[in-house]
Amino acid sequence: PTEPQSLSFCLYLGEVQKRLGKPLVLMLDEYDAPPRKLTISILRSFRSALSLADDSRPFVHAVLLCGKTHVRDLRDELRPTGDETRGSGSLWNVGLPVALPGLSQHELDSLLRDYATDSGVVLTREARDELWQRTRGQPWLVSRILYQLDEQLGSPRRSPETNLAVSSPTAQQVRAIAEQLLGEDCVHLLSVGDVVNGRKEAEELLLRLLGGEEVALSRADEVQSYLLDSGLLTASDTGQRVEISNPIYEAYLLRLLGD
């Protein structure tokens, strides 16, 4: 859509909220997937709709932007030349950037039980442990490895006792797929590289961690905060240190930054 069309849609959403009489939240999944020019056009329309909003012409209560690009990276592109806040509230405010946490080990086990019920694919205990150790519950990595297992296994055999189709992937198969991901130009890992591309301070911090240095967690540190919000870093189990989110990211970043 053109920018005027996007603005018309935003104003329409405001009318919907007004008629509902309830707060309306708009969630845009993969908001950064379209060409950058289109993404910027849509987000500028949100700015315009917000600037026009009042009691008689409301805008939506909130907009959730879900994607790989940290929304702070778009700020300069959204602000026209000379658009400074000068102490007042900016029209482009991100109330809270959030990196959705990965699955806990308990949640991953629960997901795999449901997966086994639906698909007949029952990972061995060692395979479940390997999946956890490799991914640390990162949802895309978990999903991708399970998908690849499905592709490799084909139609599961049927158990003579229950007549259910059953197959049991091994830890070795999980390990092989995880290593295979590093050799693919998959969009997810490329997006991990985009997070640090051209950001010298982020690269330096990651290289320190890759070198085995212990780094204390500090949300006040802008570089740490950026990498935590982007999902590349996570707090350690003790909550005292930062660490790279999972071994797959670690191996990818080592290859990327070591070149």
Task: Name each model feature, range by range.
Residues 8-11, 45, 126-127, 219:
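Short, conserved clusters of charged catalytic residues that mark active-site
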Residues 23-25, 33-134, 148, 152-182:
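The catalytic "switch" region of P-loop NTPases
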Residues 1-14:
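Short glycine-rich substrate-engagement loop in P-loop NTPases that contacts/grips substrate
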Residues 18-22:
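Glycine-rich phosphate-binding loop signature in dinucleotide/nucleotide-binding domains
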